[in-house]
Amino acid sequence: MAELATIARPYAEALFRVAKAADLNGWSELVSEMAQVAAHPDVYALAHNPKISDDVISSAFISALKSPVGAEAKNFINMLVQNDRLTLLPEIATQFHALKNAQEGAADAEIVSAFELSAAQLTELVATLEKKFGRKLNPTVAVDSALIGGVRVVVGDEVLDTSVRAKLQQMQVALTA
């Protein structure tokens, strides 16, 4: 994986410079969508088929995107296809978002809850977490009933686990020690 990160870094940095000069949030959404499409197994098969020309691969990829694609994005996609790097887009997107977060003083927060959170609960939870972590958070929310109750939050390499499952595991360790 380190090798993929090394290869993807210059692409992410170049794309970030272009996005910063234009519409960073718009580019961020487009990069996320491109990464999602590039991660699809059919796109992988298409990109690695030697019988299909680069132009056809680029056109097919662009047509799979729902967002409008400007000239700069088309050039970026064409460059990735010509250099056989289209399937690197998920890693490029990860690094792009890390650069965006660093500039904004923000971080991605993965919030896993035992139950579905209402909009008000999520807003309150994010506000509390932003105070705790000292930066703006971009939350992604998932539900995992195995937590039994509470939430598990991952921000970068920090984990805050207030779930019932974690408490039970701590009690089990304490009792068996």
From Swiss-Prot:
One of the record's GO molecular function terms: proton-transporting ATP synthase activity, rotational mechanism
Subunit record text: F-type ATPases have 2 components, F(1) - the catalytic core - and F(0) - the membrane proton channel. F(1) has five subunits: alpha(3), beta(3), gamma(1), delta(1), epsilon(1). F(0) has three main subunits: a(1), b(2) and c(10-14). The alpha and beta chains form an alternating ring which encloses part of the gamma chain. F(1) is attached to F(0) by a central stalk formed by the gamma and epsilon chains, while a peripheral stalk is formed by the delta and b chains.
Subcellular location: Cell inner membrane
Main localization (coarse): membrane
Entry-linked InterPro entries: ATP_synth_OSCP/delta_N_sf, ATPase_OSCP/dsu
Protein name: ATP synthase subunit delta
HAMAP family: ATP_synth_delta_bact (MF_01416)
Topology versus the membrane: Peripheral membrane protein
Gene name as annotated: atpH
Membership in a protein family: Belongs to the ATPase delta chain family.
Keyword line: ATP synthesis, Cell inner membrane, Cell membrane, CF(1), Hydrogen ion transport, Ion transport, Membrane, Transport
Cystine pairs: none
Signal sequence residues: none
GO CC, any one term: proton-transporting ATP synthase complex
Superkingdom in the source lineage: Bacteria
UniProt xrefs under Gene3D superfamilies: N-terminal domain of the delta subunit of the F1F0-ATP synthase
Role, per record: F(1)F(0) ATP synthase produces ATP from ADP in the presence of a proton or sodium gradient. F-type ATPases consist of two structural domains, F(1) containing the extramembraneous catalytic core and F(0) containing the membrane proton channel, linked together by a central stalk and a peripheral stalk. During catalysis, ATP synthesis in the catalytic domain of F(1) is coupled via a rotary mechanism of the central stalk subunits to proton translocation. This protein is part of the stalk that links CF(0) to CF(1). It either transmits conformational changes from CF(0) to CF(1) or is implicated in proton conduction.
